[in-house]
């Protein structure tokens, strides 16, 4: 069970009837928002008697009063409530592109590096589209195409950094032939396998304990014909 870190209902003006936005609206990354979201997540978990996942969204607007880094916000949410995080890699790239990041892949990778690996329970991938108008180009998380190259790059980095995670390729509109869907799933498998193989030596070098040294007088002896090979 999972849901997005967002809100969808709000009054247009103070005192007016609450309306539904029919979209995922971004929350402010502040202490107040963290308190509200933590309370709501805990209420759902108490009702369901299980931890739930909370997903980062693609945000086309931001809040001027943000005071917390997004990754830090999610880390603290997970620490407070025991929820797990659903990391949407496509949303990271979409947000970086719309923010005008000089290097969108590096910006998305920085989020991955800041998130606690133990909190991440699942990863999402998807395609995006670009819409150009009078005011410029907007990147839309529309789940209507193949996964783009920058998203694959960040996914490989995420697997190397976070370890193997269940991964879902989302494709909701303009559905292609089934073979193409399977191809995207295979690509995710291959990239994950390659990333884990590259990461494994680094992890082993960092984590492997030094061989224990046994004083000569304490070394075990074995009957003839028995021993360690």
Predicted regions and their residues:
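Short acidic, Gly/Ser-rich segments with clustered Asp/Glu that frequently serve as metal-coordination loops
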Residues: 84-86, 90-95
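Conserved, mostly hydrophobic/aromatic
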Residues: 1, 52, 88, 123, ...
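Conserved active-site loop/cleft motifs that coordinate metal ions or position small ligands
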Residues: 166-172
């Amino acid at each position: 069970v999972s849901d997005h870190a967002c809100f969808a209902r709000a009054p247009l003006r103070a005192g007016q009837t609450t309306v539904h936005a029919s979209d995922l609206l971004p929350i402010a990354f502040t202490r107040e928002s963290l308190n509200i979201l933590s309370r709501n997540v805990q209420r759902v978990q108490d009702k369901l008697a299980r931890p739930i996942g909370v997903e980062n969204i693609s945000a086309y607007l931001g809040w001027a009063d943000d005071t917390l880094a997004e990754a830090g916000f999610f880390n603290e949410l997970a620490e407070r409530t025991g929820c797990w995080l659903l990391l949407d890699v496509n949303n990271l790239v979409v947000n970086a592109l719309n923010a005008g990041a000089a290097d969108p892949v590096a910006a998305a990778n920085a989020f991955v590096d800041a998130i606690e690996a133990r909190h991440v329970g699942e990863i999402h991938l998807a395609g995006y589209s670009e819409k150009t108008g009078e005011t410029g180009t907007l990147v839309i998380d529309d789940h209507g195409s193949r996964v783009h190259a920058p998203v694959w790059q960040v996914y490989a980095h995420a697997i190397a950094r976070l370890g193997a995670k269940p991964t879902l390729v989302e494709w909701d509109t303009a559905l292609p032939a089934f073979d193409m869907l399977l191809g995207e799933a295979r690509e995710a498998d291959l990239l994950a396998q390659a990333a884990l193989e590259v990461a494994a030596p680094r992890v082993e070098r960092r984590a492997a304990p030094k061989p224990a040294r046994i004083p000569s007088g304490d070394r075990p002896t074995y009957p003839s014909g028995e021993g360690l090979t």
